[in-house]
């Protein structure tokens, strides 16, 4: 969850720097890319990858527990399976909403006149 929060924080920081550059009248697009946006691109990409890996890991763990419960593993209870499935679902929905916000922000930026 901490990786998700830090990932969102980096997205917000990048969006704020883009807004500041847009309102400040950056001379050229290459100057904007050479600024802080390019420096945080690696950080943003690594945060997104870490978030997606965690979501995938949670889903794989929940599916593994469900399969173990189905075959009758004695140390897995139905409560554990249900809680882990819901955690994986919430993580997936969170990732989906982050993706939707990023796509929406991208579309807004692309529709801006130069």
From Swiss-Prot:
Signal peptide: none annotated. It is found in: Bacterial flagellum basal body. Keywords: Bacterial flagellum. InterPro entries: FliE. The keyword Nucleotide-binding does not apply. It comes from the Bacteria. GO terms for molecular function: cytoskeletal motor activity; structural molecule activity. GO terms for cellular component: bacterial-type flagellum basal body. GO terms for biological process: bacterial-type flagellum-dependent cell motility. Pfam families: FliE (PF02049). The keyword Transferase does not apply. Belongs to the FliE family. This is Flagellar hook-basal body complex protein FliE. It comes from Burkholderia cenocepacia (strain ATCC BAA-245 / DSM 16553 / LMG 16656 / NCTC 13227 / J2315 / CF5610) (Burkholderia cepacia (strain J2315)). The lineage of its organism: Bacteria, Pseudomonadati, Pseudomonadota, Betaproteobacteria, Burkholderiales.
